[in-house]
Amino acid sequence: MTRAFNFSAGPATLPESVLRQAQAEMVEWNGVGASIVEISHRSADFMAVAAAAEADLRSLLSIPDDYAVLFTAGGATTIQALLPLNFAAPGQAADYVITGHWGKTAIKQAATSVDARIAADAQADGFVDIPPAASWTLSPHSAYVHITANETIHGVEFRDTPDVGTLPLFADFSSSIASEPLDISRYGLIYAGAQKNLGPVGISVVIVRRDLLERAGQPRADIFNYASHAARDSMLNTPPTWNWYVLGLTVKWMLEQGGVQEFARRNAEKAALVYGAIDGSGGFYRNLIKPAVRSRMNIPFFLPDEQLDALFVSESKAAGLLALKGHKAVGGIRASLYNAMPVAGAQALAAFMHDFQQRHG
Protein backbone atom coordinates (compact mmCIF):
# COMPACT_ATOMS: atom_id res chain seq x y z
CA MET A 1 0.00 0.00 0.00
CA THR A 2 1.30 3.45 -0.93
CA ARG A 3 1.15 6.04 1.84
CA ALA A 4 -0.57 9.30 0.99
CA PHE A 5 0.84 12.73 1.82
CA ASN A 6 -0.79 13.67 5.14
CA PHE A 7 -1.11 17.44 5.69
CA SER A 8 -2.87 17.10 9.06
CA ALA A 9 -2.17 19.87 11.58
CA GLY A 10 -1.90 17.37 14.42
CA PRO A 11 -1.72 14.54 15.15
CA ALA A 12 0.53 14.86 12.15
CA THR A 13 2.52 12.77 9.74
CA LEU A 14 5.45 10.82 11.15
CA PRO A 15 8.54 9.59 9.27
CA GLU A 16 7.71 6.30 7.58
CA SER A 17 10.97 4.76 8.76
CA VAL A 18 10.02 5.57 12.36
CA LEU A 19 6.61 3.98 11.91
CA ARG A 20 8.20 0.88 10.38
CA GLN A 21 10.67 0.55 13.23
CA ALA A 22 7.95 1.01 15.84
CA GLN A 23 5.84 -1.58 14.04
CA ALA A 24 8.69 -4.07 13.94
CA GLU A 25 9.45 -3.60 17.63
CA MET A 26 5.87 -3.50 18.87
CA VAL A 27 5.53 -7.17 19.82
CA GLU A 28 9.09 -7.82 20.96
CA TRP A 29 11.56 -5.05 21.66
CA ASN A 30 15.35 -5.20 21.81
CA GLY A 31 15.57 -8.87 22.70
CA VAL A 32 13.85 -8.53 26.08
CA GLY A 33 11.01 -10.90 25.19
CA ALA A 34 8.28 -8.29 25.62
CA SER A 35 6.92 -5.18 23.93
CA ILE A 36 8.24 -1.74 24.80
CA VAL A 37 4.70 -0.94 26.02
CA GLU A 38 4.86 -3.84 28.49
CA ILE A 39 8.11 -3.19 30.33
CA SER A 40 8.43 -1.13 33.50
CA HIS A 41 9.23 2.55 33.10
CA ARG A 42 11.72 2.10 35.94
CA SER A 43 13.51 -0.83 34.33
CA ALA A 44 17.08 -0.35 33.14
CA ASP A 45 15.88 -0.99 29.58
CA PHE A 46 13.34 1.82 29.54
CA MET A 47 15.53 4.18 31.54
CA ALA A 48 18.06 3.81 28.72
CA VAL A 49 15.36 4.70 26.17
CA ALA A 50 14.43 7.80 28.17
CA ALA A 51 18.04 8.89 28.64
CA ALA A 52 18.78 8.48 24.93
CA ALA A 53 15.72 10.53 23.99
CA GLU A 54 16.85 13.39 26.22
CA ALA A 55 20.46 13.23 25.04
CA ASP A 56 19.39 13.26 21.40
CA LEU A 57 16.94 16.11 21.96
CA ARG A 58 19.65 18.14 23.69
CA SER A 59 21.94 17.50 20.74
CA LEU A 60 19.27 18.31 18.15
CA LEU A 61 18.24 21.60 19.76
CA SER A 62 21.62 22.57 21.30
CA ILE A 63 19.98 22.83 24.72
CA PRO A 64 22.32 24.50 27.26
CA ASP A 65 23.30 22.56 30.38
CA ASP A 66 21.56 25.05 32.65
CA TYR A 67 18.19 24.03 31.21
CA ALA A 68 16.19 21.04 32.41
CA VAL A 69 14.27 18.88 29.94
CA LEU A 70 10.96 17.43 31.10
CA PHE A 71 8.84 14.85 29.31
CA THR A 72 5.26 15.26 30.52
CA ALA A 73 1.99 13.45 29.87
CA GLY A 74 -0.69 15.32 27.97
CA GLY A 75 -0.48 18.29 25.66
CA ALA A 76 0.33 21.98 25.53
CA THR A 77 -3.01 23.07 26.98
CA THR A 78 -2.18 21.27 30.23
CA ILE A 79 1.18 23.03 30.34
CA GLN A 80 -0.52 26.40 29.82
CA ALA A 81 -2.60 25.81 32.94
CA LEU A 82 0.46 24.81 34.97
CA LEU A 83 2.80 27.66 34.00
CA PRO A 84 1.41 30.23 36.46
CA LEU A 85 1.17 27.66 39.25
CA ASN A 86 4.88 26.92 38.90
CA PHE A 87 6.34 30.30 38.03
CA ALA A 88 4.05 33.09 39.31
CA ALA A 89 3.72 34.06 42.96
CA PRO A 90 0.22 34.58 44.37
CA GLY A 91 -1.11 37.88 43.05
CA GLN A 92 1.72 38.32 40.55
CA ALA A 93 0.95 39.26 36.94
CA ALA A 94 1.99 37.48 33.76
CA ASP A 95 1.98 39.05 30.30
CA TYR A 96 0.47 37.37 27.24
CA VAL A 97 0.88 38.29 23.58
CA ILE A 98 -2.14 37.14 21.56
CA THR A 99 -1.37 36.41 17.91
CA GLY A 100 -4.01 33.77 17.19
CA HIS A 101 -6.30 31.05 18.49
CA TRP A 102 -3.70 29.29 20.63
CA GLY A 103 -2.55 32.50 22.25
CA LYS A 104 -6.15 33.04 23.32
CA THR A 105 -6.23 29.49 24.69
CA ALA A 106 -3.01 30.06 26.64
CA ILE A 107 -4.30 33.12 28.46
CA LYS A 108 -7.65 31.45 29.13
CA GLN A 109 -5.94 28.48 30.79
CA ALA A 110 -3.73 30.76 32.89
CA ALA A 111 -6.36 33.28 33.96
CA THR A 112 -7.75 31.14 36.78
CA SER A 113 -4.49 31.27 38.72
CA VAL A 114 -2.64 34.43 37.69
CA ASP A 115 -3.31 38.07 36.85
CA ALA A 116 -3.07 37.34 33.12
CA ARG A 117 -2.55 40.62 31.29
CA ILE A 118 -2.73 41.16 27.55
CA ALA A 119 0.53 42.81 26.50
CA ALA A 120 -0.48 42.87 22.83
CA ASP A 121 -3.43 41.53 20.85
CA ALA A 122 -3.58 41.14 17.07
CA GLN A 123 -7.22 40.09 16.93
CA ALA A 124 -8.56 43.49 15.89
CA ASP A 125 -6.63 43.14 12.63
CA GLY A 126 -7.78 39.57 12.10
CA PHE A 127 -4.55 37.91 13.27
CA VAL A 128 -2.77 38.70 10.01
CA ASP A 129 0.31 40.29 11.60
CA ILE A 130 2.36 40.29 14.82
CA PRO A 131 2.58 43.57 16.75
CA PRO A 132 6.24 44.66 17.07
CA ALA A 133 7.72 43.93 20.49
CA ALA A 134 8.45 47.63 21.02
CA SER A 135 4.68 48.24 21.10
CA TRP A 136 3.91 45.64 23.77
CA THR A 137 2.70 46.84 27.16
CA LEU A 138 4.75 44.78 29.60
CA SER A 139 4.38 44.73 33.37
CA PRO A 140 7.80 45.50 34.93
CA HIS A 141 7.32 42.87 37.65
CA SER A 142 5.66 40.26 35.46
CA ALA A 143 6.39 36.61 36.24
CA TYR A 144 6.98 35.99 32.53
CA VAL A 145 5.98 37.03 29.02
CA HIS A 146 4.18 34.33 27.01
CA ILE A 147 4.08 34.04 23.22
CA THR A 148 2.89 31.42 20.76
CA ALA A 149 5.81 30.93 18.39
CA ASN A 150 3.63 29.60 15.57
CA GLU A 151 -0.15 29.76 15.27
CA THR A 152 -1.35 26.62 13.48
CA ILE A 153 -4.85 27.90 12.69
CA HIS A 154 -4.14 31.43 11.51
CA GLY A 155 -0.74 30.66 10.00
CA VAL A 156 1.28 33.37 11.76
CA GLU A 157 4.84 32.76 12.98
CA PHE A 158 7.40 34.75 14.93
CA ARG A 159 10.39 34.86 12.60
CA ASP A 160 12.63 36.46 15.24
CA THR A 161 12.87 36.11 19.00
CA PRO A 162 11.29 39.21 20.58
CA ASP A 163 13.27 41.26 23.08
CA VAL A 164 11.44 41.47 26.42
CA GLY A 165 14.34 42.81 28.43
CA THR A 166 15.06 41.01 31.68
CA LEU A 167 11.65 39.32 31.91
CA PRO A 168 11.63 35.56 31.27
CA LEU A 169 10.23 34.76 27.83
CA PHE A 170 7.99 31.67 27.73
CA ALA A 171 6.93 30.25 24.37
CA ASP A 172 4.63 27.58 22.98
CA PHE A 173 6.70 25.91 20.25
CA SER A 174 4.33 22.98 19.70
CA SER A 175 4.14 23.40 15.94
CA SER A 176 7.59 24.75 15.08
CA ILE A 177 10.05 23.13 17.49
CA ALA A 178 13.08 21.63 15.67
CA SER A 179 12.03 23.23 12.39
CA GLU A 180 15.07 25.55 12.34
CA PRO A 181 17.94 26.56 14.66
CA LEU A 182 16.82 28.27 17.87
CA ASP A 183 18.81 30.11 20.53
CA ILE A 184 17.15 28.59 23.59
CA SER A 185 19.23 30.76 25.92
CA ARG A 186 17.00 33.70 24.96
CA TYR A 187 14.02 31.97 26.54
CA GLY A 188 13.19 31.16 30.12
CA LEU A 189 11.01 28.26 29.05
CA ILE A 190 9.77 26.67 25.86
CA TYR A 191 7.27 23.86 25.57
CA ALA A 192 5.78 21.72 22.84
CA GLY A 193 3.17 19.06 22.43
CA ALA A 194 4.91 16.28 20.51
CA GLN A 195 2.24 15.55 17.93
CA LYS A 196 3.42 17.92 15.21
CA ASN A 197 7.21 17.80 14.91
CA LEU A 198 8.42 15.47 17.66
CA GLY A 199 6.30 12.34 17.69
CA PRO A 200 2.85 11.03 18.62
CA VAL A 201 0.12 12.72 20.62
CA GLY A 202 0.06 12.19 24.38
CA ILE A 203 3.46 13.50 25.46
CA SER A 204 4.98 16.97 25.64
CA VAL A 205 8.40 18.50 26.18
CA VAL A 206 9.17 21.34 28.59
CA ILE A 207 12.61 22.97 28.38
CA VAL A 208 13.11 25.31 31.33
CA ARG A 209 16.00 27.30 32.76
CA ARG A 210 16.93 25.59 36.01
CA ASP A 211 16.96 28.73 38.15
CA LEU A 212 13.29 29.29 37.32
CA LEU A 213 12.47 25.91 38.86
CA GLU A 214 13.55 27.40 42.20
CA ARG A 215 10.58 29.76 42.20
CA ALA A 216 8.03 28.90 44.88
CA GLY A 217 5.09 29.46 42.58
CA GLN A 218 1.68 28.78 44.09
CA PRO A 219 0.28 25.98 46.27
CA ARG A 220 -0.14 22.93 44.06
CA ALA A 221 -0.10 19.16 44.21
CA ASP A 222 3.33 17.60 43.78
CA ILE A 223 2.25 16.04 40.48
CA PHE A 224 1.80 19.59 39.12
CA ASN A 225 5.22 20.74 40.36
CA TYR A 226 7.80 20.94 37.56
CA ALA A 227 10.67 21.03 40.06
CA SER A 228 9.51 17.65 41.36
CA HIS A 229 9.36 16.25 37.84
CA ALA A 230 12.87 17.53 37.14
CA ALA A 231 14.20 15.96 40.34
CA ARG A 232 12.73 12.60 39.34
CA ASP A 233 13.82 12.63 35.67
CA SER A 234 10.20 13.01 34.50
CA MET A 235 9.22 9.80 36.29
CA LEU A 236 7.36 11.20 39.26
CA ASN A 237 4.52 8.96 38.12
CA THR A 238 4.17 6.41 35.30
CA PRO A 239 4.88 8.28 32.05
CA PRO A 240 3.42 7.50 28.60
CA THR A 241 6.22 5.09 27.73
CA TRP A 242 5.18 4.25 24.16
CA ASN A 243 4.90 7.93 23.25
CA TRP A 244 8.28 8.66 24.82
CA TYR A 245 9.84 5.79 22.88
CA VAL A 246 8.42 6.96 19.52
CA LEU A 247 9.46 10.54 20.31
CA GLY A 248 12.99 9.23 20.82
CA LEU A 249 12.91 7.45 17.46
CA THR A 250 11.68 10.63 15.76
CA VAL A 251 14.37 12.82 17.31
CA LYS A 252 17.05 10.32 16.33
CA TRP A 253 15.68 10.32 12.76
CA MET A 254 15.96 14.12 12.64
CA LEU A 255 19.57 13.95 13.74
CA GLU A 256 20.33 11.32 11.10
CA GLN A 257 18.70 13.51 8.45
CA GLY A 258 21.07 16.39 9.20
CA GLY A 259 19.53 18.15 12.19
CA VAL A 260 17.75 21.47 12.44
CA GLN A 261 19.92 23.15 9.81
CA GLU A 262 18.80 20.62 7.22
CA PHE A 263 15.16 20.88 8.26
CA ALA A 264 15.32 24.66 8.07
CA ARG A 265 16.41 24.26 4.45
CA ARG A 266 13.71 21.71 3.64
CA ASN A 267 11.00 23.68 5.40
CA ALA A 268 11.89 26.86 3.53
CA GLU A 269 11.76 24.94 0.25
CA LYS A 270 8.38 23.38 1.06
CA ALA A 271 6.85 26.68 2.15
CA ALA A 272 8.17 28.44 -0.96
CA LEU A 273 6.49 25.84 -3.18
CA VAL A 274 3.07 26.27 -1.60
CA TYR A 275 3.22 30.05 -1.17
CA GLY A 276 4.48 30.25 -4.74
CA ALA A 277 1.38 28.41 -5.94
CA ILE A 278 -0.81 30.79 -3.94
CA ASP A 279 0.91 34.02 -4.96
CA GLY A 280 1.17 32.94 -8.58
CA SER A 281 -2.53 32.12 -8.91
CA GLY A 282 -3.69 35.62 -9.77
CA GLY A 283 -5.98 35.71 -6.75
CA PHE A 284 -7.62 32.30 -7.22
CA TYR A 285 -5.89 31.22 -4.00
CA ARG A 286 -5.58 33.81 -1.22
CA ASN A 287 -3.41 33.85 1.89
CA LEU A 288 -4.21 36.83 4.11
CA ILE A 289 -1.11 36.86 6.32
CA LYS A 290 1.50 39.60 6.04
CA PRO A 291 4.47 38.05 4.20
CA ALA A 292 6.99 38.86 6.97
CA VAL A 293 5.14 36.65 9.47
CA ARG A 294 3.82 33.88 7.23
CA SER A 295 4.15 30.48 8.89
CA ARG A 296 6.44 27.90 7.33
CA MET A 297 4.63 25.10 9.15
CA ASN A 298 0.94 25.85 8.58
CA ILE A 299 -0.30 27.56 5.44
CA PRO A 300 -3.99 28.54 5.36
CA PHE A 301 -5.52 29.76 2.13
CA PHE A 302 -8.91 30.38 0.59
CA LEU A 303 -10.53 29.75 -2.77
CA PRO A 304 -13.15 32.05 -4.35
CA ASP A 305 -16.08 30.36 -2.55
CA GLU A 306 -16.90 27.63 -0.05
CA GLN A 307 -18.13 25.27 -2.77
CA LEU A 308 -14.70 25.32 -4.36
CA ASP A 309 -13.14 24.81 -0.91
CA ALA A 310 -15.17 21.62 -0.48
CA LEU A 311 -14.38 20.44 -4.00
CA PHE A 312 -10.67 21.10 -3.44
CA VAL A 313 -10.70 18.96 -0.28
CA SER A 314 -12.57 16.15 -2.03
CA GLU A 315 -10.41 16.08 -5.14
CA SER A 316 -7.14 16.45 -3.23
CA LYS A 317 -8.03 13.48 -1.04
CA ALA A 318 -8.70 11.41 -4.15
CA ALA A 319 -5.27 12.49 -5.40
CA GLY A 320 -3.56 11.20 -2.24
CA LEU A 321 -3.30 14.55 -0.44
CA LEU A 322 -4.95 14.19 2.95
CA ALA A 323 -6.33 16.49 5.67
CA LEU A 324 -6.29 19.78 3.77
CA LYS A 325 -9.57 21.11 5.13
CA GLY A 326 -9.05 24.32 7.10
CA HIS A 327 -9.82 24.61 10.80
CA LYS A 328 -13.48 25.20 11.60
CA ALA A 329 -12.61 28.54 13.23
CA VAL A 330 -11.49 30.06 9.92
CA GLY A 331 -12.54 27.67 7.13
CA GLY A 332 -10.77 27.45 3.81
CA ILE A 333 -7.79 25.15 3.24
CA ARG A 334 -4.76 24.48 5.41
CA ALA A 335 -1.54 22.67 4.52
CA SER A 336 0.69 21.65 7.42
CA LEU A 337 4.32 21.12 6.42
CA TYR A 338 6.03 19.73 9.49
CA ASN A 339 9.47 18.15 9.44
CA ALA A 340 8.24 14.69 8.48
CA MET A 341 6.48 16.02 5.38
CA PRO A 342 8.90 15.42 2.50
CA VAL A 343 9.60 18.05 -0.14
CA ALA A 344 7.85 15.72 -2.58
CA GLY A 345 4.62 16.29 -0.64
CA ALA A 346 4.81 20.06 -1.12
CA GLN A 347 5.66 19.53 -4.78
CA ALA A 348 2.62 17.29 -5.20
CA LEU A 349 0.37 19.83 -3.50
CA ALA A 350 1.66 22.73 -5.60
CA ALA A 351 1.13 20.71 -8.78
CA PHE A 352 -2.40 19.78 -7.70
CA MET A 353 -3.18 23.42 -6.92
CA HIS A 354 -2.10 24.45 -10.40
CA ASP A 355 -4.13 21.66 -12.00
CA PHE A 356 -7.21 22.44 -9.90
CA GLN A 357 -7.07 26.10 -10.88
CA GLN A 358 -6.76 25.17 -14.55
CA ARG A 359 -9.91 23.07 -14.29
CA HIS A 360 -12.02 25.26 -12.01
CA GLY A 361 -10.59 28.77 -12.22
Swiss-Prot record:
Protein residues bound to L-glutamate: R42
Reactions listed under catalytic activity: O-phospho-L-serine + 2-oxoglutarate = 3-phosphooxypyruvate + L-glutamate; 4-(phosphooxy)-L-threonine + 2-oxoglutarate = (R)-3-hydroxy-2-oxo-4-phosphooxybutanoate + L-glutamate
UniProt keywords, alphabetically: Amino-acid biosynthesis, Aminotransferase, Cytoplasm, Pyridoxal phosphate, Pyridoxine biosynthesis, Serine biosynthesis, Transferase
Compartment(s): Cytoplasm
One GO CC term on file: cytoplasm
Pfam families listed in its UniProt record: Aminotran_5
Cofactor: pyridoxal 5'-phosphate
Cofactor binding mode and count: Binds 1 pyridoxal phosphate per subunit.
Assigned protein family: Belongs to the class-V pyridoxal-phosphate-dependent aminotransferase family. SerC subfamily.
Function field: Catalyzes the reversible conversion of 3-phosphohydroxypyruvate to phosphoserine and of 3-hydroxy-2-oxo-4-phosphonooxybutanoate to phosphohydroxythreonine.
Subunit structure, interactors included: Homodimer.
Protein name: Phosphoserine aminotransferase
